Design a protein with these regions (language model features):
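Post-signal peptide N-terminal segment of secreted/secretory-pathway proteins
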Residues: 1-48
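Polar/charged, Q/E/K-enriched amphipathic alpha-helical segments with strong coiled-coil propensity
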Residues: 32, 36-64, 192-207
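Coiled-coil heptad-register positions
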Residues: 39, 46, 74-77, 81-84, ...
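Extracytoplasmic/periplasmic, Sec-exported soluble proteins
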Residues: 16-19, 23, 58, 98, ...
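A cross-kingdom marker for long, charged
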Residues: 136-226
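Extended amphipathic alpha-helical interaction segments
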Residues: 56-174
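Short, structured motif recognition centered on aromatic/hydrophobic residues
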Residues: 28-31, 102-107, 177, 181
């Protein structure tokens, strides 16, 4: 925690995010101290649980104060990440790194699909309430981006430019992402909820789409980052 506060005073300046880190320090430090006391305390029942009541009062007050800032902080981090990703994708496109660009863009669209669902308050337990208006637009963009990715990987000169020897660096994973999204759309259009009673993520569920997206991210990191 001390390191986080110290970094908030250092360059680069992240403006409001630095301020939020400092605002979270006091309630978070109080929570950490209280939990540390609880872990070493054996007298909960003494004095009609008075000590436990004192702990709870500190936890409730500071948890609310921390959460009020923490959620905004997480949103701010996400927004900053989106901006930086957009800048990186623009750079890749301008430099003609079309395989890398389209792979990254496909993954970004996948994240936008999940963001859209969650912004609507949707999960797999109320998936049939998902408004597909924006989802369909994202689907069409994803199809176009994956088509551009396939065209770029079919170009030997482009493979050489990006130092790739494999013309199928994603082994069809991006096509699988399209399929996973189309299964969601069909599931919603059916009016039925996906069967979540099994051990795996069923086709047509957000959980399955998230799993496939995770595979794409792992492959991207293997091909372009690692």
């Amino acid at each position: 925690l001390d390191d986080c506060v110290m970094l908030a005073d250092m360059e680069p300046d992240f403006g409001e995010m630095d301020s939020m880190v400092k605002e979270m320090e006091e309630p978070l430090r109080a929570l950490m101290g209280t939990f540390l006391e609880i872990s070493g305390s054996n007298d909960y029942a003494d004095n009609q649980y008075q000590k436990a009541k004192e702990y709870h009062a500190v936890i409730y007050a500071n948890a609310d104060a921390f959460a009020a800032i923490a959620y905004d902080f997480v949103d701010a981090v996400g927004e900053m990440g989106d901006v930086r990703m957009a800048e990186e994708e623009n750079r890749l496109k301008e430099e003609g790194m079309l395989i890398n660009y389209n792979a990254s863009r496909a993954i970004s669209i996948g994240r936008e699909v999940l963001d859209e669902a969650y912004a609507q308050g949707i999960d797999d337990w109320n998936l049939n309430e998902l408004d597909l208006t924006e989802i369909r637009k994202l689907h069409d963009e994803l199809v176009a981006v994956v088509a551009d990715f396939d065209a770029a990987t079919a170009d030997n000169d482009q493979l050489v430019k990006e130092s790739l020897s494999n013309s199928r660096p994603f082994d069809g994973l991006l096509d699988g992402l399209i399929d996973a999204l189309e299964w969601i759309m069909k599931q919603v259009e059916s009016g039925e909820l996906p069967d979540m009673s099994g051990s795996g993520a069923p086709l047509g569920s957000l959980e399955h789409f998230s799993y496939v997206l995770g595979q794409c991210i792992d492959r991207y990191n293997t091909v372009f980052v690692d």
